[in-house]
């Protein structure tokens, strides 16, 4: 898929993006699932419009060694939509800035918004901004943000099972980033990883 300004009206699709860069603009008609896995993001902007009776699921993982800026914007212009955003970010070095904004416009009803955003600070820092702009009383909305380091107790537990510290960290990071994806997308990631070795 071309990484420059993709504009599409999508009916019932799953889009898998691996290490894509640039800006993306989509309009959801019925159902859209976007799986994104990016290593070494610099700047990425995604804007999605939901009109009526649609389901949008965004599963996004970002692993960064350099400073990056990620912007996810969803505009809900209609009624009876569901928007679920799952984000996992690992800041390996430098600063990572992530902004996730969902806006439900005035005079809309029956919409549901869920933002589940998690950051892992390895040797860098991560800032995650969950933004809900709600101009109506007729919406169910929730957001969750968790940021922290790898759990040293889990590393110690894996070491007690004979796994060295570096492999224990790799296992925990892989679990952290893969748990939002379905098996088909994980297979794509594993195939890509196998081809890069």
Task: Describe the role of every protein-language-model region.
Residues 2-163, 171-179, 184-192:
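Conserved beta-strand/loop scaffold segments within soluble protein domains that form the structured core
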